[in-house]
Regions:
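Conserved beta-strand in the GNAT
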Residues: 59-61, 70-80, 96, 101
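Conserved acetyl-CoA pyrophosphate-binding loop and the N-cap/start of the following alpha-helix
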Residues: 106, 110-118
Length: 163
Protein backbone atom coordinates (compact mmCIF):
# COMPACT_ATOMS: atom_id res chain seq x y z
CA UNK A 1 0.00 0.00 0.00
CA UNK A 2 1.38 3.38 -0.95
CA UNK A 3 0.29 6.72 0.36
CA UNK A 4 1.00 6.21 4.07
CA UNK A 5 2.33 9.41 5.61
CA UNK A 6 3.04 10.90 9.01
CA UNK A 7 0.07 12.78 10.41
CA UNK A 8 0.33 16.56 10.79
CA UNK A 9 -1.35 18.93 13.25
CA UNK A 10 -3.91 19.88 10.58
CA UNK A 11 -5.06 16.21 10.51
CA UNK A 12 -6.26 16.44 14.12
CA UNK A 13 -9.96 16.91 13.34
CA UNK A 14 -9.96 13.94 10.97
CA UNK A 15 -8.07 11.76 13.45
CA UNK A 16 -10.78 12.50 16.00
CA UNK A 17 -13.50 11.72 13.43
CA UNK A 18 -11.88 8.33 12.85
CA UNK A 19 -11.53 7.83 16.61
CA UNK A 20 -15.27 8.40 16.99
CA UNK A 21 -15.91 5.84 14.22
CA UNK A 22 -13.64 3.39 16.04
CA UNK A 23 -15.66 3.78 19.24
CA UNK A 24 -18.91 3.35 17.29
CA UNK A 25 -17.59 0.09 15.85
CA UNK A 26 -16.37 -1.16 19.23
CA UNK A 27 -19.33 -0.15 21.38
CA UNK A 28 -22.20 -0.03 18.88
CA UNK A 29 -23.22 3.52 19.76
CA UNK A 30 -22.23 6.96 18.58
CA UNK A 31 -21.00 9.21 21.37
CA UNK A 32 -20.41 12.77 20.17
CA UNK A 33 -19.60 15.38 22.76
CA UNK A 34 -17.14 17.87 24.24
CA UNK A 35 -14.45 15.19 24.33
CA UNK A 36 -14.05 15.69 20.57
CA UNK A 37 -13.07 19.36 20.92
CA UNK A 38 -10.57 18.47 23.64
CA UNK A 39 -9.22 15.56 21.58
CA UNK A 40 -8.65 17.81 18.55
CA UNK A 41 -6.75 20.30 20.69
CA UNK A 42 -4.64 17.55 22.29
CA UNK A 43 -3.92 15.87 18.95
CA UNK A 44 -2.79 19.17 17.40
CA UNK A 45 -0.43 19.80 20.31
CA UNK A 46 1.00 16.28 20.33
CA UNK A 47 1.45 16.20 16.55
CA UNK A 48 3.40 19.47 16.58
CA UNK A 49 6.98 18.19 16.51
CA UNK A 50 8.25 21.64 17.53
CA UNK A 51 6.58 21.49 20.96
CA UNK A 52 7.91 19.56 23.98
CA UNK A 53 6.50 16.03 23.92
CA UNK A 54 5.89 16.15 20.17
CA UNK A 55 7.80 12.92 19.67
CA UNK A 56 5.68 10.95 22.16
CA UNK A 57 2.78 10.53 19.74
CA UNK A 58 3.15 8.58 16.52
CA UNK A 59 0.39 8.83 13.94
CA UNK A 60 0.29 7.53 10.39
CA UNK A 61 -2.51 8.12 7.93
CA UNK A 62 -3.73 7.50 4.41
CA UNK A 63 -5.53 10.35 2.67
CA UNK A 64 -8.99 9.64 1.28
CA UNK A 65 -9.61 9.96 -2.44
CA UNK A 66 -13.42 10.14 -2.47
CA UNK A 67 -15.21 13.34 -3.55
CA UNK A 68 -15.98 16.00 -0.98
CA UNK A 69 -13.95 17.77 1.66
CA UNK A 70 -10.41 16.60 2.38
CA UNK A 71 -10.55 13.57 4.66
CA UNK A 72 -8.51 10.65 5.93
CA UNK A 73 -9.16 7.09 4.81
CA UNK A 74 -7.35 5.45 7.73
CA UNK A 75 -5.07 6.01 10.68
CA UNK A 76 -2.97 4.26 13.29
CA UNK A 77 -2.01 6.27 16.38
CA UNK A 78 0.09 5.35 19.40
CA UNK A 79 2.26 6.77 22.13
CA UNK A 80 5.61 6.07 23.75
CA UNK A 81 5.72 5.57 27.49
CA UNK A 82 8.89 5.54 29.55
CA UNK A 83 8.90 3.12 32.47
CA UNK A 84 11.56 1.71 34.73
CA UNK A 85 13.88 -0.57 32.73
CA UNK A 86 13.37 -4.32 32.99
CA UNK A 87 15.55 -7.32 32.05
CA UNK A 88 13.98 -7.71 28.58
CA UNK A 89 13.34 -3.98 28.17
CA UNK A 90 16.56 -2.24 29.25
CA UNK A 91 15.57 1.14 27.81
CA UNK A 92 12.21 1.08 29.56
CA UNK A 93 10.45 2.37 26.44
CA UNK A 94 7.07 0.85 25.67
CA UNK A 95 4.48 1.66 23.03
CA UNK A 96 0.72 1.62 23.15
CA UNK A 97 -1.49 1.70 20.06
CA UNK A 98 -4.81 3.29 20.95
CA UNK A 99 -6.45 4.34 17.71
CA UNK A 100 -6.61 2.29 14.50
CA UNK A 101 -9.52 2.96 12.20
CA UNK A 102 -10.37 2.79 8.52
CA UNK A 103 -13.30 4.80 7.20
CA UNK A 104 -15.89 2.28 5.97
CA UNK A 105 -15.58 3.64 2.40
CA UNK A 106 -11.96 2.40 2.31
CA UNK A 107 -12.05 -0.94 4.13
CA UNK A 108 -10.45 -4.00 2.59
CA UNK A 109 -7.56 -2.12 0.99
CA UNK A 110 -4.90 -2.92 3.60
CA UNK A 111 -4.78 0.58 5.07
CA UNK A 112 -5.04 -0.51 8.73
CA UNK A 113 -2.12 -2.90 8.25
CA UNK A 114 -0.04 -0.36 6.34
CA UNK A 115 -0.52 2.46 8.86
CA UNK A 116 0.09 0.11 11.79
CA UNK A 117 3.30 -1.24 10.19
CA UNK A 118 4.49 2.36 9.77
CA UNK A 119 3.68 3.01 13.43
CA UNK A 120 5.58 -0.12 14.52
CA UNK A 121 8.62 1.08 12.55
CA UNK A 122 8.30 4.48 14.25
CA UNK A 123 8.25 2.78 17.67
CA UNK A 124 11.31 0.65 16.81
CA UNK A 125 13.26 3.75 15.69
CA UNK A 126 12.65 5.22 19.16
CA UNK A 127 13.97 2.21 21.06
CA UNK A 128 10.57 0.82 22.02
CA UNK A 129 10.89 -2.89 22.79
CA UNK A 130 7.24 -3.87 23.36
CA UNK A 131 3.99 -2.52 21.95
CA UNK A 132 0.59 -3.22 23.45
CA UNK A 133 -2.95 -2.63 22.18
CA UNK A 134 -6.52 -3.64 22.88
CA UNK A 135 -7.96 -5.43 19.86
CA UNK A 136 -11.60 -5.51 18.87
CA UNK A 137 -12.98 -8.91 17.92
CA UNK A 138 -13.08 -7.83 14.26
CA UNK A 139 -9.44 -6.70 14.23
CA UNK A 140 -7.90 -9.46 16.34
CA UNK A 141 -6.95 -11.54 13.28
CA UNK A 142 -5.11 -8.57 11.75
CA UNK A 143 -3.00 -7.98 14.84
CA UNK A 144 -2.24 -11.67 15.33
CA UNK A 145 -1.08 -11.86 11.71
CA UNK A 146 1.32 -9.00 12.47
CA UNK A 147 2.85 -10.87 15.42
CA UNK A 148 0.79 -9.61 18.36
CA UNK A 149 -0.18 -12.13 21.02
CA UNK A 150 -1.31 -12.28 24.62
CA UNK A 151 1.23 -10.87 27.04
CA UNK A 152 -0.63 -10.86 30.32
CA UNK A 153 -4.13 -10.38 31.61
CA UNK A 154 -5.08 -6.74 31.03
CA UNK A 155 -7.16 -5.29 33.84
CA UNK A 156 -8.55 -1.77 34.00
CA UNK A 157 -10.37 0.43 36.48
CA UNK A 158 -12.43 3.55 35.72
CA UNK A 159 -11.37 6.31 38.13
CA UNK A 160 -13.55 9.04 36.64
CA UNK A 161 -15.96 8.93 39.59
CA UNK A 162 -13.31 8.55 42.26
CA UNK A 163 -12.91 11.67 44.36
Amino acid sequence: VTGVRTARPDDARELVRLRRLMFLGMHGRDEPGPWERDAVRTARRLLDRELPGGERLGAFVVDGDQPGPRHLAACSVGSVEERLPAPRHPAGRFGFIFNVCTDERYRGRGYARATTEALLDWFAERGVTRVDLHASTDAEHLYRSMGFGEHSIALSIDLSRRG
